[in-house]
């Protein structure tokens, strides 16, 4: 489906003036030569919504989607778009509970950039040291891979943090370290992606419930514990959820 089952609605009509999603889609198609599928385009347009002051509406984007859906390709496009087109050279941080996952996504982005002569010409350096992989552009833009842990990303101010496999985070250590890195930068976003988690996925469960409560708790995650007048107090306007999932109680083959 192009549209997720559960999602944070936009504050106003989305146009080229109120979302940078179209810019990112055009970068994918006209520069990288990648044709995005409808759900990827829909998500970029909605998740890159702008506030009236021109900053991103969402500081945190939670993406729930099945494996093999094209999630990694979209994240790579997003990362390169910001690296090459942001006015201020950004720092992109890629992280995951398993470093191999973050390095695999980073490697794909490097290959994308190298495959386009105009982009390849802007590459200053590609660091391949174990645990310190980085793509550096002439402009000063960086895309670094960090292990998700207490030290992951600390001391770095990330403009875009790509946090994959959120379901694997069973403690708050890594999330706290990474989320902390973006607070110092205006225009920064954390994109946290995952497929469905289980009871041990504490970070995913909390972020999902917080976002759902702001939407009136459509799946009953709070178990009726939140009074309607409390929903506004608990809502976090800077948290967006985009969830492609089956409704509770639906058959597995829906």
Language model feature labels by segment:
Residues 1-254:
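Phosphate/NTP-binding elements of NTP-utilizing enzymes
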């Amino acid at each position: 489906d192009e549209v997720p089952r559960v999602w944070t609605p936009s504050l106003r009509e989305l146009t080229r003036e109120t979302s940078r999603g179209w810019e990112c889609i055009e970068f994918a198609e006209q520069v990288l030569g990648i044709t995005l599928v409808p759900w990827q385009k829909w998500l970029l347009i909605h998740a890159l919504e702008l506030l009236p002051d021109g900053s991103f509406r969402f500081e945190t984007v939670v993406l729930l989607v099945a494996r093999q859906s094209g999630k990694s390709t979209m994240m790579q496009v997003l990362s390169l778009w910001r690296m090459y087109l942001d006015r201020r050279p950004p720092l992109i941080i890629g992280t995951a509970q398993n470093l191999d996952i973050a390095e695999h996504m980073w490697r794909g982005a490097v290959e994308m950039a190298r495959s386009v002569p105009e982009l390849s010409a802007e590459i200053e350096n590609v660091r391949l040291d174990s645990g310190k992989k980085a793509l550096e552009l002439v402009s000063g833009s960086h895309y670094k891979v960090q292990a998700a842990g207490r030290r992951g990303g600390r001391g770095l101010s990330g403009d875009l943090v790509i946090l994959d496999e959120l379901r694997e985070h069973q403690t708050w250590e890594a999330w706290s370290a990474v989320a902390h890195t973006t607070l110092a930068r205006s225009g920064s976003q954390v994109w946290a992606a995952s497929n469905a988690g289980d009871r041990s996925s504490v970070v995913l469960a909390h972020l999902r419930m917080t976002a759902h409560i702001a939407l009136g708790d459509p799946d009953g995650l709070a178990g009726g514990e939140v009074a309607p007048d409390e929903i506004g107090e608990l809502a976090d306007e800077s948290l967006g959820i985009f969830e492609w999932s089956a409704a509770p109680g639906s058959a597995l083959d829906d």
